[in-house]
Each structure stands twice: as structure tokens, then as C-alpha cells.
Amino acid sequence: MIFGKAINRYYLKHAPVLLLGILSLLTVDYIQLLIPELYRLVINGANLGQVVVDGQTLPFTREVLFQHICLPMIWIVVLMVIGRFLWRVCFFGSAVSVAADLRERMFDHSRRLSQQYYQVNKVGNLMSLYTNDLDTIQECFGDGILMFFDAAVLGIMALVKMWRMDCKLTLLALIPAAVMFVLGTVMSQVMTRRWEERQQAFSDLSDFAQENFSGIAVIKAFVKELKELIAFRRLNKENEEVNVAYTKIATLLEVLVTLFVESVICVILGYGGWLVWRGQFNAGQLVEYIGYFEAIVWPIMAISMLIEKTSRGKASLNRITELLDAPIDVADRDGVADLRDPHGGIEFRHLTFRYPDGEYDVLKDVSFTIKPGESVGIVGKTGAGKTALVDLLLRTYNVPDGTLFVDGQDVNAVSIHSVRDACAYVPQDNFLFSDTIAHNIGFGVDDASQADIDRAAALADVRDNIVDFKDGYETVLGERGVTVSGGQKQRISIARALLKNAPILILDDSVSAVDTRTEKIILDNLKTSRAGKTTLLIAHRISTVEQLDKIVFIEDGRVEAVGPHDELYRSCAEYRRMVDLQKLEDEEGGGSHG
């Protein structure tokens, strides 16, 4: 059995079912210990020609054999089958339910964690929590309760019967048990550490494989297959070594338990045989005594298995608890209200921001205003802080009080859900789900109609590409959309955002993978379809945003200029230098980009 704040609640939640299982287990254990008495009757009846039943000496006849031995044995077997089926359903059914509920808690908590958590913790490590560690918890919960009560109850009842038959023989048999208990306690601590190392090694291996499969195109392009194979072999070797180390400890424990069992059998046969020779035991009683010991062999073995499972369970529970205890850094404050009827007004007011693990401010005293319905371009060099503005607007990170307002309300005074719901977002990394194109476009809108999906695809200039596919909108994309081109992937992401028709549309460098003609079509469609709604378009190229209502030019985290393209070109030297440089690059490159 394992205990911890992440799992203790389930013992209470499933208490009625677990108590029924324990009651069934106790019943099975009790009637199981009636079998050695039947052994004694058979042996003594065969040797002496008579048996003692309930204090009466009876001749060993067919009637006595059937009535007092065979018939009781049939009932014992029937009751044991029913009881074992019942406790299996109770214990293992509860364990499955616990794993399912714990998995849901983990997923619910994971989705509320900030972006910072996922930058530190890799996908492979997280996935191992949902697979290996949860499976271990499920196994420990069901088997752990079974082994604990079975070992305790069956072991105690069998020992009581053995003690009543001969206390000296029982004391001799218990000496190896005491040694085994001490060794098991010490070894359980070692096994817990070894299991934690094993799980971490598996997580590292899983994460490495996941990254390689996701980036297989890059690996092939740079001809690094052999290098990655060598790195995988190294991690696989480390995983093998920690698995072997754990297996050695587990095997040693199993060998010690087997040695204990065999040594006790030697004691029973030696001393018990001597008692039979002296006439203090008859052959039937010795067989009965051995039958009781056989009944506690399973509890003895269960102790070994319980130590191993508990060690693994503690390690896995610690890893899962770390996830469940991970702080939710970005969360609603008490008493926040929803952002009602948003119009798309945005104001940054003297905002300075540094990422939680950052060493310097990525935004410095940023101030500018976007009126509802304006189309605004945000431009600057790579690393200037453009994406940081989006991160804060979407409340991906915590925003300093009094520095960011939506429709005149401090974003910290309104719910995160309502702020994000007022926005449609196309990130730099255009993520697509491994699902149909229709599902990907309609992801942001519940029950989106096919007509709406088709219209959004047309606005993103991707409809013609989609209908050319064999299955059209029902084409299933590969993982992360790898079955479509970069430009198609980008335009499907734009269609998904346009379908939401949110008051605020944010496109973060979202037309970089399309040609100039397609870019112009998309921008023209945005202008007509987004009339009266706020649009933020982050871009590296000035030509992408020069026709927008105004442009915010950012340099080294500071807003250097805000205004229409022509005004910035006249008044801002750095902006003018960037425009001229990009024009020169276009002329040298034939005027194309993407």
C-alpha cells in the first residue's frame, strides 16, 4: 500500500467497495485454513483406520470420508472461487477507477500550468507520468491492498493455528522471518531510489525519441542520423544499466525470501519429524502443520512483492505528486469579472516585463494604444520583444498591475478565460492537430458549419488547395500537420483564427511561408472581413504591414515609434533604415520572399 496526499482520498472514496473486498478476502483466508484439517483426517484415517471429528472418534469409512472430508472440501472450493472473484472485482476495479481519476486530475492540472512549466519539463518526461507511473500506481493500489491484508490476515491466522499445535516449533520457524523483515526494510529504501532512477532514465529516453521523430526531417536534411543513433544508444545503455541495477535488487530480495521459505521447511521437517518420532505429533498433525505453513508461504512471498511494489509505487507517486503540486503561476485573482461585450481596445501603459527565467527585461516602459477596429502592425528586429507583447495580451505570463488594459479594464481585473476568448491567435509555430482539415479549421468554434469552415478557408486562400485533396476537408493530417506544406499549414491556421471571428485577431509572423501574391490576397481579405474589428499583425517585413492603420516599431524592447507607415518613414531613422534595407534585399532577390 502507498500513501500520499495525491492518493489518500481514494481510500476513503472507495471505502465501501474496498471493505467488501477485504471482507471477501477474510472469508477466503478463513475457509482456506480449514483444508489442512482435512489433510490430517485423511492421513490419520489411512494410517490409523479412524478419525477424530468434533471430539468424536469415528471409524474411517466411505460415509465418513464423503461426509466429513469430500463434501466440506467441495464447499470450501466453491466459496473460495466466489470469494476470490469478488475481491478481485473490488480491488482491481477500484484500482482502475483510481488510475482513471488520477489521470484526469493530472490532465486538468497540466492544462492550467503556465508556459514556463512546459519550457522546463519536456514532453517525453510528462508522457511517462501518464503511462509508466500511472500504471505503477494502479498496480500498487489494487495489488497493494490485496497483498497487505492477505499477508496480514492469512499469516496471523495460520501462525495462531501453528502456535496452538506447537509453540516451540513455531518460534524456531519465525527466526528467519525476523531476519527477513529487517533485510526487507533496508532493501525497500534502496529499491525506491533505484526505481526513481529507472523512471527518470525511461523519461529521458522517451523524450529523446519523441524529439527525434518530430524533427526527423531536420535530422535527415543535415545527415545526422548516425549521430542521433549514437546518442540514442548512449541513453538506451543508461536505461539498461539502471534497469539491471533495479532487477538485481529485486532478484536478491526474491532469492532471500525463497531462502527463508526453504530454511523454515527444513526446520519444520527436522524438528517436526523428531516430534513424530517421540510420539508428541502423529503423521496427520505434522501434515496439518505443514499445510498451515504452506498457507503462509504466499504471505511471505507477498511481503517480498509488497516491498517491491511499494518501493516502485512511492517513487512513481512522488513523480506524479510533483506534477500535481506544480504551482499554477498564471491564474485568476479572487473576485475577477468576465470581460463582457469586448470591442477590441488595447492599451499598454509603461509596461516593463522580464520572462520568469530571464536575465534581462524584454519589454521596457512600453506604452501605446490600439483603438477598437484598428489594424495595427508590430515590427522590429528578431528578439525585439514583439512576441512578448502577444504573450502578455493572451495572459500566457503574469502582467504587472496597471500596465495592460483591454477595453479600458486592467487585464488582471478580468478573467483569463474571457480575455483569451476575445482573441483569435495564429502563433509563429502553426500547430495543427492530427485530425481532419475541417476539425482543425473549426477547432475554435463549437458546432461550426461546413459553410462557415469553407468561407474561412476561402478568406485564408487555402480552399482551392483543400478541395484538390482526395478527401477534401475530411483529409486527415499527420502529426502536427506534416502532410501539408508549410504555406498550407500556415493558411489553415489563419482560417482557424478567422472562423472564430473574435474582436481581436493576432497574427504572429503568420504569412512568412506564403508567396507575395498569396500574402496580398490574405491581407486584402483580412481588410474586408475584419472591418470594425481589431487586428494585430506581427511581421518582420515592413511590406506586410505598411497598408495597415498604424505600425508599432519596437527596438530592443522599447517602442521607438507609433503611427502610419509614411509618418514613421519620415520621422524615425531606424524604421527608415529597416525599410530601405528590406527594399534593397527584395531588389537583389528579385522581389520575392517566403
Where are these regions (language model features)?
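Transmembrane helices of ABC transporter permease
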Residues: 13, 17-29, 76, 143-197, ...
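An intracellular "coupling" helix at the cytosolic face of ABC transporter transmembrane type-1 domains
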Residues: 12-13, 115-116, 132-141, 145, ...
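Helix-loop junctions and hydrophobic alpha-helical segments within the transmembrane domains
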Residues: 106, 110, 219, 320, ...
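Conserved catalytic Walker-motif region of ABC-type ATPase nucleotide-binding domains
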Residues: 110, 232, 320, 348-350
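Juxtamembrane loop-to-helix connectors within ABC transporter transmembrane domains
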Residues: 2-3, 91-92, 111-156
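ABC-type nucleotide-binding domain
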Residues: 339-594
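Membrane-integrated ABC transporters
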Residues: 1-35, 47-72, 86-91, 95, ...
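Helix-loop-helix
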Residues: 161-175, 245, 249-318, 324
